[in-house]
C-alpha cells in the first residue's frame, strides 16, 4: 500500500509536524500563566475531572489534533466498534468488550446477532453459582464449604482481574462482602508461583478456577494440572468435580480434564484477552470473592464511560482527549514512554494491567492494511503508586529523560486515617504530593531561584530543574467498584483511540506467537535430553551453550515422580 494512505500522509498530520517547532519554543511556566488556557484544558464526567493543562500543548494544538481525529475517521471507527463490525481484520473478529457491561436491554450485534442476551445469560449463571458458593450450599468433597479461590490464567486472564481485585480489597463495601474469603491468582508457569498461590491453603476448602478459552494455553494448563494433582493427592480423583471449575468454550477438553461442563462459563471470540476482565474471566472469580452485586457496580461504572466515549463531543471526551494527547507525545514530540502514577495504594496493580493493555494493543510496526509505518506508535508503560514512586524513579522523570506522566488521585480515601496532633490526615499528606508533583515537573527550578536561596555555586547545576515536563491529572471522587470500572474503561478506550488514529490494529497480538513456537522446539530438546540422553542440536551456538549449561545440572527429582511445591 502506498504511504499516502497512511495517516502520516495527510495534511492534518503534516500541520501538526509543522506545529512542533512552535511548541518546542514554549515553556510550561509560560503556558500555565494563561488562566483561560488552563480552564479550557479540562473535562469532567460524573465527578471524574481531567486537567491536561500541563501538557506541552496550546489551544491551537488541540484544534489540530481534533482535525487529525477527523482525518483518521475516528468517529466512524468508534461507531464500527460499537456496532460489532469486524474491525479486528487480521483475525476477522468483532471487538465487543463494551457488550460485556451493556444494560440487559441493549442491542449490540456481531454477525447480525444481538450478543447482549447471551452475555447476560452467562452473567445470570455466574450470579446464581456465586450465590450458591458464597452461601455455603456448594461444598467440597469432604462436605466443607469452600472459602478460598485460586484463579489460574495468564496475560489478560490474570492482570485485569488482579487489578480489580486489588482495588476492591480495601473498599469498605467490597471488603465487608469478602470477609472470611481469599482470592488468589496463579499465572506464571514458574513453580515458585504455584507454591505462593497455595501457601497455607487447604485443598478441602479451595476452589480452583481454570481460565483458558481453548483449554490449551500451555502455561495455564500446566498450572491447572499441577493444582489438580494438589487436590487429588489430598482428596482423591473424585474431588476434581467439586473443587475445579472453568472459564472456557472448549467443553470437550473441560470434560476430559475432569471438570463438569455445567460448571464451565463461556466467553467469546469477540473478546480479546486483555479486554476480558468484564467477561467471565474476571466476573466469575470476583463474584466468588465479593458477590455479584459488587461486581455489577464495577460493570456499570465501565458502561457509564462506554456511553460517555460513544456520545460525548471529542472536545470534552475524556478517553478521546487522552488518546489524542498520547499520539501527540509519542509521534510528534518523540516521547517513547508514559508513567502511570496513581496516588492510591489500592491502584497498585493498575500500571501492570495498562502495561499489557497498551503495549500489546499498540506495539505494532505496520498499519491495519499491512503497510510499514514511518512513524512511532505505542508507549513503554510503567508506574508505581505515589508516594512510593517518588523514592524510586521520579529522579529520572525530574532531571533525566522527559516522560509524560498520568497522575491519578482520589478525593475520598477508602481507609481514612487522622491522628490527633498531626497537621493533616494521612490522605491529605498523600494528596499534597499528588498536587505538588505535576507543578514541580512543569515549572522546575531555575539557577536564578537557587542563587536567591544562597545555594552554593557548585551545587547549582545539580539542583537545577529544567521543568517543561508534561503531565496530566485525573481526579476521581472516590474509589468504589463503580469508579474502578470507570477507570478501566477510560484506559481501554484511550488506547483504542491511539490505535484508531495511527491506523493500526489494536486488537490482535501476533508478536507473542514467535516466542511460543521457538519455546516448543526447546521443550522437545529438554525432554529428549532428560529422558533419552539426546545431544543438544538444531540451535545457534549461543543457545546451544546455554542449554548445555542448564542440562548439565541434573534435576533433584526424577521425571517420573510427582512432586508438589512446599513452602
Swiss-Prot record:
Keywords, alphabetical: Cytoplasm, Gluconeogenesis, Glycolysis, Isomerase
Catalysed reactions listed for this entry: alpha-D-glucose 6-phosphate = beta-D-fructose 6-phosphate
Cytoplasm listed as a keyword: yes
Pfam family, one: PGI
Subunit structure, as described in the record: Homodimer.
Enzyme Commission no: 5.3.1.9
Protein name listed in UniProt: Glucose-6-phosphate isomerase, cytosolic
GO CC, alphabetical: cytosol
Active site: 360, 391, 516
